[in-house]
C-alpha cells in the first residue's frame, strides 16, 4: 500500500490528476496499444476531473488513445437523466477532452438482461488485457463502487441492491428525496477492481475517516469492502487531513516519512 497523507481536498485532486497524467504519458499510448483507465462518479473526483481538464487544455496530456471503463450505473434510470452516471461523466469530463466516443465504456442500466450486460462488460475489459489504473472513491461505510458492506471480496460485475445508507447519501443528487434514488445499480465487483494493475482511491472529508482507518489499519473484512485493497500489489490511497482523523498519529507519521518531501513533486498546492 502507498498512502499519501495531504492537507486539503484541492491537494488531493491535483495530486491524483498529475498521477493519472504521468501514468498516461509514461505509457505512451497508441491506437493499437491504448492506456486503459477506470473512472468513478460522485462528489470526490469532481475536482480531479476539473484539474485533468485544465491540464488537457494546457497541452499536458491527450486522451485520444485512452480507453475508459466506469465503475457503475443506476438501473432503470435513463441515460439522458441529469443524475445518470452517463450524464455525469459527459458533463463533467468527457465533453471537455479529446477522448474518442468509441473508447468510452459505461454500464447500461436499461437493458432487458442485466446479467448479460454485466458479462459483456467483463469481457470487454478482458479484451484490453487489463485496466492499467482504476481511480475510485470510497463510501462512508467503506464501500467501493456499489460493492456495499458484506459484498463478496471476489465478486465480478453484477446487479446490486443499494443500502439505505447509500440511498440517503445519494439523495442529495435527487432533491434530497430518497424515494427518487434508484434502488439498484450495476457495478464492477471487488474482484474486478483487484484485477486492475493499479488502484487509486481518493478520500476527502471527516465523514470518510472511518473508511480510511479500515483501509489502512483494519483487517480485511467484507463489511468494509475497501479493506480488500490491502491485498492489491499497487494500492494507492490519497487523503486530505480531515479523512485522516481516525488514524493513529504514528501511522500518518510513518507514511509521511515514506513519501519524503511530497510537496512540490506530485501535486500542486493551489
Swiss-Prot record:
Q: SUPFAM superfamilies, alphabetically?
A: NagB/RpiA/CoA transferase-like
Matching Pfam families: Glucosamine_iso (PF01182)
Entry's CDD domains?
GlcN6P_deaminase
Extract the PROSITE patterns matched here. GLC_GALNAC_ISOMERASE
Which residues are listed under the site Part of the allosteric site?
151, 158, 160-161, 254
Active site located where?
72, 141, 143, 148
Enzyme Commission numbers on file? 3.5.99.6
Q: What function does the entry list?
A: Catalyzes the reversible isomerization-deamination of glucosamine 6-phosphate (GlcN6P) to form fructose 6-phosphate (Fru6P) and ammonium ion.
| Quaternary structure (record) | Homohexamer.
Provide the family line: Belongs to the glucosamine/galactosamine-6-phosphate isomerase family. NagB subfamily.
Protein name in UniProt:
Glucosamine-6-phosphate deaminase
Q: Which gene encodes it?
A: nagB
Amino acid at each position: 500500500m502507498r498512502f499519501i497523507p495531504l492537507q486539503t481536498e484541492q491537494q488531493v485532486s491535483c495530486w491524483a490528476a498529475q498521477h493519472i497524467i504521468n501514468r498516461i504519458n509514461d505509457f505512451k499510448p497508441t491506437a493499437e496499444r491504448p492506456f486503459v483507465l477506470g473512472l468513478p462518479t460522485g462528489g470526490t473526483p469532481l475536482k480531479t476531473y476539473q484539474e485533468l481538464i485544465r491540464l488537457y487544455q494546457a497541452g499536458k496530456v491527450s486522451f485520444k488513445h485512452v480507453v475508459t471503463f466506469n465503475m457503475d450505473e443506476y438501473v432503470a434510470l435513463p441515460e439522458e437523466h441529469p443524475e445518470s452516471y452517463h450524464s455525469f461523466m459527459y458533463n463533467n469530463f468527457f465533453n471537455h477532452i479529446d477522448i474518442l466516443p468509441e473508447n468510452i465504456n459505461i454500464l447500461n442500466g436499461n437493458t432487458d438482461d442485466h446479467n448479460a450486460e454485466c458479462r459483456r462488460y467483463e469481457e470487454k475489459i478482458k479484451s484490453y488485457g487489463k485496466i492499467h489504473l482504476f481511480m475510485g472513491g470510497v463510501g462512508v461505510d467503506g464501500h467501493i463502487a456499489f460493492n456495499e458492506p458484506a459484498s463478496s471480496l471476489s465478486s465480478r460485475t453484477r446487479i446490486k441492491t443499494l443500502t439505505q445508507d447509500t440511498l440517503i447519501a445519494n439523495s442529495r443528487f435527487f432533491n434530497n428525496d430518497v424515494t427518487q434514488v434508484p434502488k439498484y445499480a450495476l457495478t464492477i465487483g471487488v474482484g474486478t477492481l483487484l484485477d486492475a494493475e493499479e488502484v487509486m482511491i481518493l478520500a476527502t472529508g471527516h465523514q470518510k475517516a472511518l473508511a480510511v482507518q479500515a483501509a489502512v489499519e483494519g483487517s480485511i473484512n467484507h463489511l468494509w469492502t475497501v479493506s480488500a485493497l490491502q491485498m492489491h500489489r499497487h494500492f494507492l490511497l490519497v487523503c486530505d487531513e480531515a479523512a485522516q482523523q481516525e488514524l493513529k498519529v504514528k501511522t500518518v507519521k510513518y507514511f509521511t516519512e515514506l513519501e519524503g518531501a511530497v510537496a512540490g513533486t506530485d501535486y500542486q498546492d493551489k
